[in-house]
Amino acid sequence: MKIAQINTVCGNGSVGRITVDIYHALKKSGHDGKIYYGRRTAPDSVTTEKIGSNLDMGIHVLSTFFTGTHGFNSHAQTKQLIESLKAYDPDLIHMHNIHGFYLDVEELFAYLKTCGKPVVWTLHDCWSFTGHCAYFDYVACDKWKTGCEKCPQFRNSYPYALFKDGSKVNYARKKAAFQGVKGLTIVTPSKWLGDLVKESYLQEYPVKVIPNGIDLDKFVPQKTKKRDKHLILGVANVWDRRKGLEYFKELHGMLDPEKYEIAVVGVNKKQIKELPQGMIGIEHTQNVEELMELYSQASVFANPTLEDNFPTTNLEALACGTPVVTFATGGSVESIDETCGRIVPQKDVKALYKAVTELCENVEQMRGACRERALLYNKYNRFGEYLDLYEESIHHYNNL
């Protein structure tokens, strides 16, 4: 098989790493692959092609910022991608994030409707079926089910627009572009997101759930020095409003400082200065060993997220033997059961406090069950599911 993958980035961030991992799984199984990406740099070990330049991306950002439209610029860059796809001639095209200021989605989908190739599209958020937002739980909006307009967060949620709410036009254009692709299969990492797709204008397509996985040879329980206090850990790539940093601050004020301490990883310098006294802030780290040590030292991993698909941080904590407590948000609940964590109502800090303190008292009895739960999410099994899906899709398409 020859598989072309398309994503905003390659080797960076969770989705960028997934594309690279799938590429290596293909090569290991004797297949061929190529990754097309729009931003940053890519690992030397991967066959790639960058679409456009930083200047092109900047123009797209400004267009979104001033006109409220997103995904309808970058015409020349999209033509470059299409010509390269024609030359590479893959057996299947696998798209991940097609937002991110690097593609004209109308032009890309016009090609997909005529190229004679099966398509797999993995959705990592909700952008594909809304007029603006990547997530809408925070504002409890369901306009995407019938038609977006008067977006309540076009100014303060990605992709940011300053002057104009383009959600009504964006919704109509995306709906027209994304419907009617022969042989397209949608993949979601969570059942939660898959169920949303079935309520959206993408409901014509089959949906397969393939959860994110992690490297269980890398994330393993570590022997660490016993701490004087129970450590409650939080980890995020970016601590924006939906990740729940404010709830950690509230929780900190409720916990006995003689028995508990909180550490949050991924905060910036400004956020560190704003943390309450005694709360530990650690800047973003890509060091797996450092993360493993923190996960293993923690008595509880807390994830008070307000919008999420299927966070791999939950899996990383479980793999290191640490129970997880999460708000009942999106797909964050799907990796947790009573043997390895707790699920509490959104924004309920009293329930969060109760769950955290209860788990701290029972953590040593739960560590084995946490690791067992993580074994369900071995990333190599997940990539095997993708390779099986590729073969099924190609076979099915050739027999349509």
Segments and roles (model prediction):
Residues V187, K225-K243, K249-H252:
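Conserved donor-binding/catalytic core segment of Leloir-type glycosyltransferases
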Residues W192, G213:
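Carbohydrate-associated surface elements
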Residues G266-E289:
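Nucleotide-activated donor-binding/catalytic signature segment of Leloir-type glycosyltransferases, i.e.
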Residues L306:
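Aromatic "clamp/platform" in nucleotide-sugar-dependent glycosyltransferases that forms part
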Residues P323-T326:
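Short hydrophobic beta-strand element within catalytic cores of glycosyltransferases
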Residues E338, R342-V349, T357-V363:
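Conserved acidic donor-binding segment of nucleotide-sugar-dependent glycosyltransferases
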Residues E364-N399:
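A charged, aromatic-enriched C-terminal amphipathic alpha-helix characteristic of glycosyltransferases
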